[in-house]
């Protein structure tokens, strides 16, 4: 059986977990937490990173930092995981669902402005499959209407958004990435590819769930790009206390000063993640090779109109988080998944439309979201993981060709 996903282990995880266990500091915010946070801040340019126990927790922290009050409106795509909405619903927000683009599951930035009212407070673009949304358009709207932007970058670690940042002045060196390499990171420096996904909005939430490119079993991270929110974020992260200030020597004791929760992960989780971070570029290189093999082998079928392949906009890079194709009907997708399963290959569909979910359908305003519904009915995800081989990909593509009678 070729599974849909298989977690990749670098071989360093147990070594670092052992090191964490013997450090005398297991409860979190120790050496491995700091290594990971420093790495992400220096590699991508975030103002502040805080590891969390899940991406859901990172989104919930963002919702608190956005000061969501009952009745505030938050615009999100309907084609997303429930955590995107749930984090804001828990704070009392009313969710306003936006449709996807016709050719991509990402939110249609051209349809957002019509949804903005005097109660709108936040826009939450979701970078589906690691492909960035049209952030220039979204940030222009945020500035125009004084809104906050939370990037749901759960799938988008090591993705980039264009246009490219300004080049360093002549004679100067851009050290954003070389600094990261000094943090015990032996991987090569990635090429400059624009702004990192998650660095553009006020906040971004990342996932290190076992299905993601780099993993810690469960785990996430809140990235903060606006310095106004860093101080309060540390308090919320530490159960509503000013504990971080105490350990920096800024106060002589700490106490309960704000709302919050136990969002920080243990050092065991952070140690596992650090082993993955050290191999980030190697993991990315392999996944991209597999992604391009899929694309090259399936493009002739897509050119015949048998299905639709992922569309990559000119302003975004591909981090090879996922390879999917879009069938022309629900029945066709069901038949394709069955054909693959009959050949010991596990392919899966993805999200159901949140606007028609049992929990929220009676709260939705009734607008039709046809593009979202199309992806909910027709999108199928193919196996993608580090240990997948090119021969595996070729076999999968051969079965797909058999299904469409092109062999």
Language-model regions, residue ranges each:
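Active-site PLP attachment segment
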Residues: 199-242, 267
